[in-house]
Amino acid sequence: MSKKQNGYDDSRRYFLKSSALAAIGASAVTLTLPLRASGSSTTMRLKVTGYDYDRVAALATGKVKIEGCDLEFTPGKIGEMNNEAFGGSQTFDISEIGLIPFILAYANDDFRDYTLLPVFPLRVFRHKSIFIRTDREINKPEDLRGKTIATPGYSSTSLTWIRGLMQDEYGISPSDIQWVTSGKDSSADISGTVSGYENLIPDGLNVKTGSPDKDESDLLESGEVDALFHAIQPRGFIQGHPKIARLFPDSRAAEQTYFEKTGIFPIMHAVAIRKSLLDENPWLAQAVFNAYSQAKQLTYKKMLAMGWAYDALPWYGQELEATQAIMGNNFYSYGLEPNRKTVETLCRYAFEQGLSKRLLKVEELFSPEGLAFVEEV
């Protein structure tokens, strides 16, 4: 592209680089910062919501700016953020959003009010999220076939990933399970209420609703179910219930093996931006992407230099080094291309599990401006 084209000047390049990073061996990320339309001097005010994770904190506190914008950051919970975007007042210009709820809203209900940027603020391996009763002869994944499994809701991103990996890696179909959706969720104070798109149940499955006064941990503790799929550790596991354990005793090893085999680091949430705002200000997509990336790079820098001091884990440094050895320095990557397989896999799971009406192409979900955004490591 020429230096000036369509009223925008992309000649400046922003280098997320410092001598401190170089000294400790961190990868620098080069980003192209767009300028606003020629002659524009107005500062845009943006309302943004999301969790204030370490990798987002510099943006939330204002240490990192979105070029040409003043930012009002409101911490939120994913259930409420989903409901606000899909059926609420849509107060926020930019919102963290559940990836499966967005896929379902887009595919099933022609939701187009927001579009995604290839920024993924929450990613989690999910082998650790399968909990079992130790008195039900469940010793390996295949033993879940025919068992009764509780879930809070059914169609959340985390649960879709778990069912998908069970199908792909161990041949266990959702139809092989007797499902119980819990009437309550013990993690609601963290995740918020289960949003509408997280509670869709496809036809053809054996699904019943648990007692309205019991949460998912109650069902597992009482023995009403054999196992539990849940994004967050259930109360019974945290409190050391003698008959509750993880399906994978060494879930870390299982997750690392899965990553080495598939290259997938499961994405839970993405960043969505109001489409009408982006249509009027196409430069904003790059500016927002750059800001989230810069905030993440500052977190990398802190992790490498002094993370061991700010975190209570005694072997923090070794954990970070081990992660980088397996996944690379930019292990929490943004941009579509390095994450294409992961997003394609989740779109496939949504369709195969009967949640989405059609199999989406990943390009449909993201703003056209954002398809080519990269972090040049």
What does each model-identified segment do?
Residues 41, 45-175, 179-188:
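Short, glycine-/small- and polar/acidic-enriched structural segments
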Residues 351-377:
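Conserved C-terminal helix/tail region of periplasmic/extracytoplasmic solute-binding proteins
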Residues 8, 31-49:
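C-terminal segment of N-terminal export signals and the immediately downstream linker at the start
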Residues 74-85, 177-218, 364-371:
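Short helix-initiation/N-cap motifs at beta->coil->alpha
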Residues 14-36:
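N-terminal export signals
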Residues 1-14:
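N-terminal secretory signal peptides
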Residues 272, 277-352:
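Secondary-structure end/capping motifs
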Residues 190-304:
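Pocket-lining segment of extracytoplasmic ligand-binding domains
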